[in-house]
Structures are given as structure tokens and as C-alpha cells.
A protein has these predicted regions:
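Amphipathic alpha-helical dimerization/coiled-coil segments
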Residues: 1-43
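Heptad-repeat amphipathic alpha-helical coiled-coil interaction surface used
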Residues: 24, 31, 38, 45, ...
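Acidic interhelical loop/turn segments
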Residues: 44-68
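Long, low-complexity, intrinsically disordered segments
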Residues: 108-116
Length: 116
């Protein structure tokens, strides 16, 4: 999209003045949603290609518009996931290490180990 208007981004913009944990949770939710949507898109892509290469499909398919739209959706969700992972890592470094709400088992949110 040429313009992004998103309630989550408004929350992220104001995160420093608000509840950082709530923002973290909202980003996690968005990441999980994008991951599920990406999986659906990838299954659809596999069905469309039906064993053919992308090059062969685009050269021979009757319609290419739906495929081109699909690969834009795939790219969009991949970018959403990358951004969410980065944002979650930054937030994890900023929150206190004794944060009772942290996900100790979530390797995506754990910073580097320290001795000391």
C-alpha cells in the first residue's frame, strides 16, 4: 500500500508514554496473525503453481493478476513479521529483566546472556 494507516502503529508511536507491555502484546498478536496469513498465502501459491516454476506459470497461465496480487501479499506479510520481530526485540531490551509479564521461554524476546 502507498499509505499505511494502522491502529497498531499509532500505539507503537505512543508506546513511550503508555503501556509498553500492552504494545508488546499487540505486536505479538499482529506477528502471529501475519504468520498464519503468510502460511495460507504460501499454500495458495503452491496450489496455483501446481508443481510448475514461477517462470513457467507466469509464461503460460491464462490469468496472472491473481498471482501477482498474491506475491504482493506474501511480501507484505513477510515484511510485517520482520518488523514485528525487530520491534519485539527492541522492546524486550527496554523492559526490565524482572518483568513478570515477560516470556522467558520465547527465544524471540530474550536478549543476549550476561554473566554477572
Amino acid at each position: 500500500p502507498s499509505v499505511i494507516r494502522d491502529e497498531l502503529l499509532i500505539k507503537v508511536q505512543a508506546a513511550d508514554a503508555g503501556d509498553m507491555r500492552a504494545v508488546r502484546d499487540a505486536i505479538r498478536e499482529r506477528r502471529d496473525w501475519a504468520t498464519a496469513k503468510l502460511a495460507r498465502y504460501q499454500r495458495l501459491r503452491a496450489r496455483l503453481l501446481d508443481g510448475r516454476s514461477e517462470e513457467d506459470y507466469l509464461a503460460r497461465a491464462e490469468r496472472i493478476g491473481p498471482y501477482l496480487t498474491l506475491i504482493r501479499g506474501i511480501s507484505f506479510e513477510e515484511d510485517n513479521i520482520r518488523w514485528a520481530e525487530h520491534a519485539l526485540a527492541v522492546i524486550a531490551r527496554r523492559l526490565p529483566t524482572t518483568d513478570a509479564d515477560s516470556d522467558a521461554g520465547d527465544s524471540r524476546l530474550v536478549g543476549p546472556a550476561t554473566n554477572g
